[in-house]
């Protein structure tokens, strides 16, 4: 069955037309069904008619601009007749609301339909004097770079199909410099934190079923496109990317680009001893150096789950450690670094093998560290102002004044994490402390999590990790500590609540059609059409599929236009080819006559 989601074809974006202020809608032709996928012309006609009826119902009843990604028409070899039919389906009233059309990746198909409609209806879209009140103005755009100069593309939901087509024209999307200043440093950090969390969540669900994850590289084009999207802080739908590309971005961009390497090779003493004591002592030195303990506590168990599912992932501790070493040790793959990579790979293998015991040793004695002797461990602030210093320790200050025994009981589980290791507050204890009335009495500085703690992306899990990007490591924090890089964006003393606008820009699930009942009916109707018991149609479908396979193997030309002339056609097929062209022309004329009467 062919899955057609109307919400992917026509939808409202978060961007607006900068000139008129009208909302911008998007028509993505790459999601239109191809006639070759259906196999039968009659069924395809019915499908296009039903699809256009659904799209007409979604048209807004207010002025708007429309962005058309037209590459799907040529890629899916949709006949120009269907372009005329789609235009004829539009009600006459829509011309009052549709103000401007941006046609991106214009193809021969779009030019043909535009010329045919213009000649048949005897009007010109670009004539601002005669038809500016009757028909929208057209703006022909070559690629996404040109589109970025007209509207804000960071708020558009651009599909991966469109990005891949645009990549053939230009490998990188060059946007105006002002794009990088539209978000504040806090919003940029929130955006990239959200991308990191969403990718990690997807990896936890899907990586256990993928063979040689983190070893097989992702698609080069897709990875480059993804990195460009992050650089622009663009809207992104993660459901369109394959798991290997996401794993490459997560490991080689977020993890590898942290301010300090997760496994510094310089801190691994030689010779390496493959036992628990040596591995544990070295690990304590490492986390004391980079303060990434909380990150380790989340990603290492995830790596061990990949090893546990070795039947599907084809990984053991040796192969996985070898794949992770360049990113975790922040080393390049070259002949000059082979010795260093061998050291890092051997230690990472031991760390994966002994980590359950190491995690128990590290997390077992938090109660003994909760004494007041841990307070001097914190570095002194740049200024001696107590308000600046209390931003990291603001949750512990009210406890010293409170005589309540109930509050003093809960403080040991919270204080050592906030004071000794700097970042991570457990989600459950964080939610209790925020709701406690003692923290609302005199907060030194307002904390966003107090007002909206429910906006934390992963409030009940430890996947709310530090942002692994070099750009975020330079963000200014109230108190400069060695572990400021490892502070999570939520559930921490400097809690950065992710705003609703930033949340809307990163999606990990495909868009769903709001009219679910109508969608089910539409799918049922289409299924009933495909299940018609007609021997003639089945035979015709089989012949079309055989012709399609034959054409794919014989014709490898990259030209969009056929290299065969009329004399090249076999005598037995000349009549049928001419008949098909003549029938197509008659259908186009019939549709245009009907359109004239309606418009």
Swiss-Prot record:
Name a single GO cellular component. Answer: cytoplasm
* Pfam families noted in UniProt: CRAL_TRIO_2, RhoGAP
Any one GO MF annotation of this record: GTPase activator activity
- Record's superkingdom? Eukaryota
Which stretches of sequence are listed as region Disordered?
A: 362-447, 468-495, 543-563
Q: Where is the Rho-GAP domain?
A: 181-359
Alphabetical UniProt keywords: Cell wall biogenesis/degradation, Cytoplasm
| Positions of the record's site feature: Arginine finger | 215
- Listed Basic and acidic residues bias regions: 543-562
Protein name, per record: Protein ECM25
Species this protein is from: Saccharomyces cerevisiae (strain ATCC 204508 / S288c) (Baker's yeast)
Gene (UniProt): ECM25
């Amino acid at each position: 069955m062919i899955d057609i989601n109307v919400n992917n074809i026509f939808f409202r974006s978060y961007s607006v037309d900068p000139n008129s202020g009208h909302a911008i809608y998007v028509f993505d032709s790459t999601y239109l069904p191809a006639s070759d996928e259906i196999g039968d012309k009659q069924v395809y006609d019915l499908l296009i008619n039903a699809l256009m009826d659904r799209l007409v119902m979604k048209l807004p009843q207010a002025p708007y601009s429309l962005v058309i990604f037209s590459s799907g028409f040529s890629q899916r070899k949709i006949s120009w007749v269907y372009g005329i039919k789609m235009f004829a389906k539009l009600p006459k009233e829509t011309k009052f609301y549709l103000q401007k059309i941006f046609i991106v990746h214009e193809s021969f198909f779009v030019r043909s339909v535009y010329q045919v409609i213009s000649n048949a209806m005897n009007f010109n879209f670009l004539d601002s004097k005669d038809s500016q009140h009757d028909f929208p103005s057209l703006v022909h755009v070559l690629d996404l770079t040109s589109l970025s100069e007209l509207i804000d593309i960071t708020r558009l939901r651009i599909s991966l199909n469109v990005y891949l087509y645009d990549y053939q024209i230009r490998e990188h999307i060059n946007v105006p410099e002002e794009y990088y200043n539209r978000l504040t440093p806090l919003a940029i950090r929130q955006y990239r934190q959200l991308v990191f969390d969403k990718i990690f969540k997807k990896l936890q669900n899907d990586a256990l079923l993928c063979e040689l994850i983190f070893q097989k590289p992702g698609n080069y084009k897709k990875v480059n496109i993804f990195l460009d999207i992050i650089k622009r802080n663009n809207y992104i739908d993660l459901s369109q990317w394959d798991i290997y590309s996401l794993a490459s971005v997560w490991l080689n961009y977020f993890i590898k680009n942290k301010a300090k390497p997760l496994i510094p090779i310089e801190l691994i003493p030689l010779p390496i001893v493959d036992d628990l004591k040596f591995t544990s002592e070295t690990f304590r030195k490492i986390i004391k150096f980079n303060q990434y303990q909380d990150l380790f506590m989340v990603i290492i168990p995830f790596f061990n789950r990949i090893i546990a599912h070795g039947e599907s992932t084809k990984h053991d501790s040796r192969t996985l450690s070898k794949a992770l070493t360049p990113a975790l040790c922040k080393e390049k793959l070259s002949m000059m670094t082979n010795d260093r990579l061998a050291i890092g790979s051997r230690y990472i293998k031991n760390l994966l093998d002994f980590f359950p015991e190491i995690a128990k040793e590290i997390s077992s004695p938090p109660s003994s560290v909760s004494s007041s002797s841990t307070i001097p461990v914190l570095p002194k602030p740049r200024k001696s102002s107590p308000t600046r210093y209390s931003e990291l320790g603001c949750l512990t200050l009210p406890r010293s004044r409170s005589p309540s025994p109930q509050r003093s009981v809960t403080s040991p589980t919270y204080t050592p994490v906030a004071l000794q290791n700097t970042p991570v507050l457990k989600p459950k204890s964080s939610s209790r402390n925020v709701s406690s009335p003692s923290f609302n009495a005199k907060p030194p500085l307002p904390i966003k999590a107090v007002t909206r703690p429910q906006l934390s992306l992963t409030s009940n899990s430890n996947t709310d990790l530090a942002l692994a990007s070099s750009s975020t490591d330079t963000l200014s924090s109230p108190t400069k500590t060695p572990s400021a890089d490892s502070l999570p964006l939520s559930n921490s003393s400097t809690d950065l609540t992710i705003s609703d606008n930033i949340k809307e820009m990163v999606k990990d699930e495909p868009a769903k059609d709001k009219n679910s009942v109508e969608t089910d009916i539409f799918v049922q109707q289409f299924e009933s059409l495909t299940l018609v018991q007609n021997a003639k149609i089945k035979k015709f479908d089989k012949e079309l599929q055989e012709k399609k396979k034959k054409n794919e193997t014989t014709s490898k030309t990259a030209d969009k236009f056929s290299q065969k002339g009329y004399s090249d056609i076999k005598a037995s097929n000349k009549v049928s080819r001419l008949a098909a062209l003549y029938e197509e022309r008659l259908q186009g004329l019939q549709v245009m006559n009907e359109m004239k009467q309606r418009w």
